[in-house]
Each structure stands twice: as C-alpha cells, then as structure tokens.
Curated annotation (Swiss-Prot):
UniProt-recorded name of the protein: Uridylate kinase
Position of the signal peptide: none
EC number of this enzyme: 2.7.4.22
Subcellular location: Cytoplasm
InterPro entries, per the entry: AceGlu_kinase-like_sf (IPR036393), Asp/Glu/Uridylate_kinase (IPR001048), Uridylate_kinase (IPR011817), Uridylate_kinase_bac (IPR015963)
Catalytic activity: UMP + ATP = UDP + ADP
Keywords, sorted A to Z: Allosteric enzyme, ATP-binding, Cytoplasm, Kinase, Nucleotide-binding, Pyrimidine biosynthesis, Transferase
Pathway given in the UniProt record: Pyrimidine metabolism; CTP biosynthesis via de novo pathway; UDP from UMP (UMPK route): step 1/1
CDD domains recorded: AAK_UMPK-PyrH-Ec
Length: 241
C-alpha cells in the first residue's frame, strides 16, 4: 500500500452530487467520474465504505407539499438511496472494482441485508461496501447513518464529499461574500456555532466516538485521493478538543 493517512474510511456521498448540474436523477458522466476516483483510491489499498444519500431522487419537501406523513416520506427517501447505491455499484464493477451493497431494509433480491461483521469482512477482502436505506428507521438522516456506520466498522475518518463546496464556511459563500472558510474545527464547534454541515445527532455520534470528519469538494479531480493521503484540503473536523 502507498503511504496513506486513513486506511479505512466512510465516504458520505450525497444524492445531489450524483445528479451534478442536472439537479435530479443520476448524471452518467458524473457517477462514472466518481467511480473512477474511488477506483484510484481503492487501488492504494484503502478500505472504502460509502453511505449514499437520496436527495436527487426524493426530497422531504415534496412529501410536505403532498401532506404526507414524515415517516412515509422518509421511507421513500430510503428507497431513493438504494437506487443510487445500485447505480454506483454498477459503475464501480464496470471498472473491475468488487463492490457489495448492503441495505438497512431487507431486499434480498437486489442487495445484502446490513450485517456489521459481514461488511467488515468485505472491507478486509478489499471490496467496496455501499450502505443504503439509511439506518432503516425514519427521522434519521444519512449523515447520522455515516456516523453510525463509521463507529460500527471502525472507520478512521468520515469523508464528506460536497458538490462544488470546498469546505465548511461561517455562512453560505454563494450568498454571503464575507463568509469565512474554516480549515479546522471540532465537532463541538459545529454544534455550538450551528454550522450547516451535518445534523446534531451525527455530530454528537462522531464526537463521542472520536471520528474525524473531512469536508471537501468532490468536483475537483483527485480530491478523494488527496484526503486519504492526509493532504490539507477542505475542512477537517477533529473528533475531540
């Protein structure tokens, strides 16, 4: 293995990132590019697990507009993550990268059920594991899923790949020209400052388990490899003070 800082990681990949400029659905060139970047990191010997979001397939606001119960809307969102997971699996396997999808809601015809020990074994065999369907329970975000799965599988870091955003800012840089980028924070800083990075549950889980978070721009070629190598890009959120 080439010298890397993180040897087992969870990458949080939003659904919006897979949509690219289209905004919704899956953008074929984008998902192929993501798969190629992941292959390059996999070739370094890094054990990679991925948590996919579903915002390109379903938004909670749509459920609200329909007068839908939150629980029902959340389940639809979980199914959206499964579609993204299967598409990403296919893109990775087309590049020769062995990949397994595990879902928190059982659907054995298309994916394995989530079993922690089996997921770890896949990683040890140098297979990429994609976690879909969130935690399997409503009211929990895929950010929380990332923190939970990272703790369960012993990931050394959570890589939060953002669509066109190169780190954490004091405000939305697209709206506020005075927004300041942070190079380093703690999870408590995120909670105290109310920064819109991940929800409080996810931040608390990461803090309690001392799991660092790296927020970086997915659209910049080679950034995933730079993060696992320990280069200072984006914003690093430390697991403890």
């Amino acid at each position: 293995m080439s010298e890397v800082k993180y040897k087992r990681v969870i990458m949080k990949l939003s659904g919006e990132a897979l949509a690219g400029d289209k905004g919704t659905g899956i953008n074929p060139p984008v998902i192929q590019k993501v798969a190629e970047e992941l292959r390059d990191v996999h070739d370094l010997g890094v054990q990679i697990a991925i948590v996919v979001g579903g915002g390109n397939m379903w938004r909670g606001e749509t459920g609200e507009q329909l007068g839908m119960e939150r629980v029902q809307a959340d389940y639809i969102g979980m199914l959206g993550t499964v579609m993204n997971a299967l598409a990403l699996q296919d893109s990775l396997e087309s590049l020769g990268v062995p990949t397994r999808v595990q879902t928190s809601i059982e659907m054995r015809q298309i994916a394995e059920p989530y079993i922690r020990r089996k997921a770890v074994r896949h990683l040890e065999k140098n297979r990429i594991v994609i976690f879909a369907a969130g935690t399997g329970s409503p009211y929990f975000s895929t950010d929380t899923t990332s923190a939970l799965r990272a703790a369960e599988i012993g990931a050394e870091a959570i890589l939060m790949a953002k669509n066109g955003v190169d780190g954490i800012y004091s405000a939305d840089p697209n709206v506020d020209p005075d927004a300041v980028k942070f190079d380093e924070l703690t999870h408590m800083d995120i909670i105290d400052k109310g920064l819109n990075v991940m929800d409080t549950t996810a931040s608390s889980l990461s803090m309690e388990n001392n799991i660092p978070l790296v927020v970086f721009n997915l659209n910049q070629a080679g950034n995933i490899k730079k993060v696992v190598a320990g280069e200072n890009i984006g914003t690093t959120v430390r697991g403890e003070e």
